[in-house]
């Protein structure tokens, strides 16, 4: 029996113990399983309280059962849901009973969603939106994921693909009537106009500069500077907990420490790097090398120094802010020199000036992400396939190109959009996409 023909089950809720747990069953034998456990099939889509019993008749739990007959279910198959008390023993007894049914097996990660995809309940971009929703850490990420799950990109791609196929039909009709010049011209003219319009529309989406991808991946802020200037104290204050060791001895931090922040709904990763200095210690040298590498790759660098040190930052990056720390210990201010980067005076230990720095970080994040929720593209896969589709459309518009070549380019463009939606040639990416889902989803 092919794995997709088997009935699957899994715990669909979080770690046990918990108030309740939900076990989901999907496949052709779901109704048989539900009847065996409860004695009868409940009315479709109605929660019914029932006794759940093993095949020997022993009581497993007093629970609730729901029945979703095909095709009106999340997977497009017969689906049963069993709501039980969230006890490890109860869940184990139910799973043991389910495992005893012939043709019924535990689900693989993401298999419920994959079956929904294969049965036309959602396209591949919507499945990716569901994955993003599951992994969303901030409110902005949640809203973007819901838009993708709702079909904001999939609906647009379907419309583009349908219009390309319409244009292709006109081109192929023009080829059929190539002996009748006037008829062929009348068909090719509207086709080229439609192609040009679609090409411009897809190009506009590609020009979004990765807003959706930025929101999905987050912004990276690196804290860099000489040893013993308070970098670990600052990251602890940003995290509102102790994540880095604070020591008066220089060189305490030798590896990169990361924390995740939610700045007004925007996802930000802050990294605490090793102090930058010359050292004979091979371990510290490696820490310094990593620190410079991570700072150079960051979207923003906070160059931390003491309040009396006005030297220029010793790192490169797209945006560098100078942060003068330990102002609570300083006896006076020093004049700033060098490039006109923002300068903040704080005490990471007492919190003085920290609110101003945090406010500017939040403002910078808002500018960095822009109106990210308006972006359609949230993954590199989307961008590559849309770029392929757009390139084929552009080539089809080359003046003097033979109609047969135009038709071939349009087929290639439609094929790229089909891959985007998961309609054609996507077996190589399905395992990667659905493998990210948890078991039971």
Swiss-Prot record:
Name all TrmE-type G domain ranges.
218-366
Q: How is the cofactor bound?
A: Binds 1 potassium ion per subunit.
The cofactor named in the record is: K(+)
Residue positions annotated to bind GTP are 228-233, 247-253, 272-275
Concerning InterPro entries, the annotation shows: AAA+_ATPase (IPR003593), G_TrmE (IPR031168), GTP-bd (IPR006073), GTP-bd_TrmE_N (IPR018948), GTPase_MnmE (IPR004520), MnmE_dom2 (IPR027368), MnmE_helical (IPR025867), P-loop_NTPase (IPR027417)
Keywords of this entry: Cytoplasm, GTP-binding, Hydrolase, Magnesium, Metal-binding, Nucleotide-binding, Potassium, tRNA processing
Which top EC class applies here?
A: hydrolase
Q: Which GO terms describe its biological process?
A: tRNA methylation; tRNA wobble uridine modification
Residues annotated for (6S)-5-formyl-5,6,7,8-tetrahydrofolate binding in this entry: 24, 81, 121, 441
Broad class of where this protein is predominantly found: cytoplasm
- State the GO CC annotations: cytoplasm
Q: Which residues bind Mg(2+)?
A: 232, 253
Question: According to the lineage, what is the superkingdom?
Answer: Bacteria
Q: List the Gene Ontology MF annotations in alphabetical order.
A: ATP hydrolysis activity; GTP binding; GTPase activity; metal ion binding
Q: What is its EC number?
A: 3.6.-.-
Q: Subcellular location, in the record's words?
A: Cytoplasm
Entry function? Exhibits a very high intrinsic GTPase hydrolysis rate. Involved in the addition of a carboxymethylaminomethyl (cmnm) group at the wobble position (U34) of certain tRNAs, forming tRNA-cmnm(5)s(2)U34.
Q: How does it assemble?
A: Homodimer. Heterotetramer of two MnmE and two MnmG subunits.
The Swiss-Prot or TrEMBL record describes its family as follows: Belongs to the TRAFAC class TrmE-Era-EngA-EngB-Septin-like GTPase superfamily. TrmE GTPase family.
Protein name, as recorded: tRNA modification GTPase MnmE
The organism named in the record is Rhodopseudomonas palustris (strain ATCC BAA-98 / CGA009)
The gene that this protein is the product of is: mnmE
């Amino acid at each position: 029996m092919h794995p997709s023909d088997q009935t699957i089950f899994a715990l669909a809720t979080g770690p046990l113990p918990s108030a309740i747990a939900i076990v989901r069953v999907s496949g052709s034998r779901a109704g048989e399983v539900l009847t065996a456990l409860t004695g009868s099939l409940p009315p479709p889509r109605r929660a019914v309280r029932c006794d759940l019993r093993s095949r020997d008749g022993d009581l497993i739990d007093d629970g609730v059962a729901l029945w979703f007959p095909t095709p009106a279910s999340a997977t497009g198959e017969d689906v049963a849901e069993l709501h039980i008390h969230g006890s490890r023993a109860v869940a184990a007894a139910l799973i043991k009973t389910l495992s005893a049914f012939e043709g019924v097996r535990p689900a693989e990660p993401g298999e419920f969603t994959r079956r929904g995809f294969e049965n036309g309940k959602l396209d591949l971009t919507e499945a990716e939106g569901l994955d993003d929703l599951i992994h969303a850490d901030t409110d902005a990420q949640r809203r973007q994921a819901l838009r993708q799950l709702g079909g904001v990109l999939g609906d647009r791609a379907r419309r583009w693909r349908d219009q390309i196929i319409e244009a292709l039909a006109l081109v192929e009709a023009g080829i059929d009537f190539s002996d009748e010049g006037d008829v062929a011209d009348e068909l090719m003219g509207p086709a080229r106009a439609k192609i040009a319009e679609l090409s411009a529309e897809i190009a506009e989406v590609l020009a979004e500069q990765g807003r959706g991808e930025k929101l999905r991946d987050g912004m990276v802020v690196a804290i860099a500077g000489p040893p013993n200037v308070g970098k670990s104290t600052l990251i602890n204050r940003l995290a509102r907990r102790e994540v880095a060791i604070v020591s008066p001895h220089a060189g305490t931090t030798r590896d990169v420490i990361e924390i995740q922040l939610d700045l007004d709904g925007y996802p930000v990763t802050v990294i605490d790097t090793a102090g930058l200095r010359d050292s004979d210690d091979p371990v510290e040298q490696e820490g310094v090398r990593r620190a410079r590498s991570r700072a150079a790759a960051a979207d923003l660098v906070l160059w931390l120094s003491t309040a009396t040190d006005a030297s220029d930052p010793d790192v490169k990056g797209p945006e560098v802010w100078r942060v003068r720390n330990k102002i609570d210990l300083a006896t006076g201010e020093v004049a700033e020199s060098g490039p006109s980067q923002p300068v903040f005076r704080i005490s990471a230990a007492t919190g003085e000036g920290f609110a101003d720095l945090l406010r500017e970080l939040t403002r910078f994040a808002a500018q960095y992400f822009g109106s990210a929720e308006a972006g359609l593209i949230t993954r590199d896969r989307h961008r590559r396939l849309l770029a392929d589709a757009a390139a084929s459309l552009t080539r089809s518009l080359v003046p003097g190109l033979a109609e047969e070549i135009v038709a071939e380019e349009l087929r290639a463009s439609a094929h790229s959009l089909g891959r985007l939606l998961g309609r054609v040639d996507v077996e190589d990416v399905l395992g990667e996409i659905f493998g990210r889902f948890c078991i039971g989803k």
